[in-house]
Amino acid sequence: MKKALMIASVLLIAVISTACINNIAVQELNNKAAEFMQKGDYESAMNRLQASLDLDSTLYETHYNLGVAAINAGKYEKAIEALENGLKLKPDYVEFYYSLGVAQAELADEIIDSDDSDDNEHKPTQEELDKVKSLRIASNENLSKYLEKGPSSKDKETIEELILENNKFIENDDNLVKVEK
């Protein structure tokens, strides 16, 4: 009985020690990522944040920061993935909705811009049109949720403009020509 208690105690201490070491490592990785973000080195920040999530994927803040870093790095699909994962952990964190809406709109723009060419003969495929439209619709849903949930949206006007721009694309998806403001 004493032996079993001793083994259980050693295992408990090992588990607690590992958890503490992981928490310290996660904190260090997140701090380093913040430094990289301040310097504009979003790729390095993303690497640190992903390593942090590999150690502890339960921190919604790390998912959010990874999403923001990915948006700034132009990695919109990665941003959407990170933000959706974080949103599952903390659906009442309103900033997820804003950043997710922005990432979705930016990815839609990227798909459209990749179709721009000098020969003007390239027509987007139906699959591309469908993806752009669904991204714009999802973007509007997330931006609208942000406005609903965000008690003091300082950037309300900017968000409403993005929603209007999304609507122009949704309504004109047959030609996908950017409508100038």
State the predicted function of each range.
Residues 52, 85-86, 146:
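Canonical positions in the second alpha-helix
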Residues 117-181:
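Terminal, low-structured helical/coil segments at or just beyond the last alpha-helical repeat
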